[in-house]
C-alpha cells in the first residue's frame, strides 16, 4: 500500500527512541514472556523464536532472555502478565491501536485513557478501529540490495502475499500464520531483512498536515513512555517534510 514505508519508518524511529530511553529490554522481556506461555522451546514455538530474534537484534543479554523464557513457562515467578489491546482516536481523527502487556489492567487502561485525552485524542470502544488494520508479517529489505522480482520469487512459494516498493525499501507482507516459513525462506536464500515483525498494518492511510502529525507523534511518544505499552499503531500518512525532519 502506498505510504506504508513512511509508517514503517515511524516504527523504526520508535525503536531507536526506546533504546535511548533504556526501555527496550523491558519491552523485549515482556514479548518473550508472553510468547513463552505457548512453550519454552523456540524450535517448536515460532512466536518465541521471533521474540528471541528481536531481543538479540538489540543486543539483549542471553541471561535476560533465558530469565524471561522461564517466567513465561512458569519456572520463575513474574510471568503473570497478559496482552491487552486498546483502541481510540488521535488528533485529526487518526485511528490508534495500543498493544499493552500488563499485570494490572485497571491501572493500564486508566493511564492509556489519560494519555489519549491529554494528547488530543480519546479512548474508543472495543472494535471501533481494529477493523481498519490487518495483522501481517512484515519484512523490510533494502531496495539497493534486492529487487522486487527477486523477493517475490523467494517469498511467494513460502506464502508471501505481496512485495511493496516505496522510496528505499521493499516490504514483503504475509499472513501471520505464514510468517515463520517466509522468514525461513529468506534466511535460506541469504536475504537479510532490515527489520522483521508482526504488525498491524493500516488498510488505508489518512493524510494529516504537519501540525497534526507533530501532535500525533507527541501522543505516540507519551503512550510509549508507559512501561505497559508495547506498540502503538496508527493509520496516519505522515507528511514527507516531517519525515525529512526526522532523518536530520
UniProtKB/Swiss-Prot annotation:
Keywords associated with the record:
Cytoplasm, DNA-binding, Transcription, Transcription regulation
Q: Where in the cell is it found?
A: Cytoplasm
In its UniProt record, a GO molecular function of this protein is:
DNA binding
- Example GO biological process: regulation of DNA-templated transcription
Q: Which domain of life is it from?
A: Bacteria
Q: Does the keyword Transcription regulation apply?
A: yes
Q: Does the keyword Transcription regulation apply?
A: yes
Principal location class:
cytoplasm
**Which family is annotated?**
Belongs to the TACO1 family.
Q: What is this protein called?
A: Probable transcriptional regulatory protein Desal_2886
Species annotation: Maridesulfovibrio salexigens (strain ATCC 14822 / DSM 2638 / NCIMB 8403 / VKM B-1763) (Desulfovibrio salexigens)
Upper classification of the source organism reads: Bacteria, Pseudomonadati, Thermodesulfobacteriota, Desulfovibrionia, Desulfovibrionales
Amino acid at each position: 500500500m502506498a505510504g506504508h514505508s513512511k509508517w514503517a519508518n515511524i516504527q523504526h524511529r520508535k525503536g531507536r527512541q526506546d533504546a535511548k530511553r533504556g526501555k527496550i529490554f523491558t519491552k523485549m522481556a515482556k514479548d518473550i514472556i508472553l510468547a513463552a506461555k505457548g512453550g519454552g522451546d523456540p524450535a517448536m514455538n515460532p512466536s518465541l523464536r521471533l521474540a528471541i530474534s528481536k531481543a538479540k537484534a538489540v543486543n539483549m543479554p542471553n541471561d535476560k532472555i533465558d530469565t524471561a523464557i522461564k517466567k513465561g513457562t512458569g519456572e520463575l515467578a513474574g510471568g503473570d502478565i497478559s496482552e491487552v489491546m486498546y483502541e481510540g482516536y488521535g488528533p485529526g481523527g487518526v485511528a490508534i491501536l495500543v498493544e499493552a502487556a500488563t499485570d494490572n489492567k485497571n491501572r493500564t487502561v486508566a493511564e492509556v485513557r489519560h494519555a489519549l485525552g491529554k494528547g488530543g485524542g480519546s479512548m474508543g470502544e472495543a472494535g471501533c478501529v481494529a477493523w481498519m488494520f490487518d495483522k501481517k508479517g512484515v519484512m523490510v529489505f533494502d531496495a539497493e540490495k534486492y529487487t522486487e522480482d527477486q523477493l517475490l520469487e523467494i517469498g511467494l512459494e513460502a506464502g508471501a502475499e505481496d512485495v511493496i516498493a516505496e522510496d528505499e525499501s521493499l516490504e514483503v507482507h504475509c499472513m501471520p500464520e505464514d510468517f515463520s516459513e517466509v522468514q525461513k525462506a529468506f534466511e535460506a536464500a541469504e536475504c537479510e531483512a532490515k527489520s522483521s515483525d508482526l504488525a498491524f498494518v493500516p488498510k488505508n492511510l489518512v493524510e494529516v498536515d504537519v501540525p497534526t502529525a507533530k501532535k500525533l507523534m507527541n501522543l505516540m511518544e507519551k503512550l510509549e513512555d508507559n512501561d505497559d505499552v508495547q506498540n502503538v499503531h496508527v493509520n496516519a500518512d505522515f507528511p514527507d517534510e516531517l519525515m525529512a525532519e526526522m532523518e536530520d
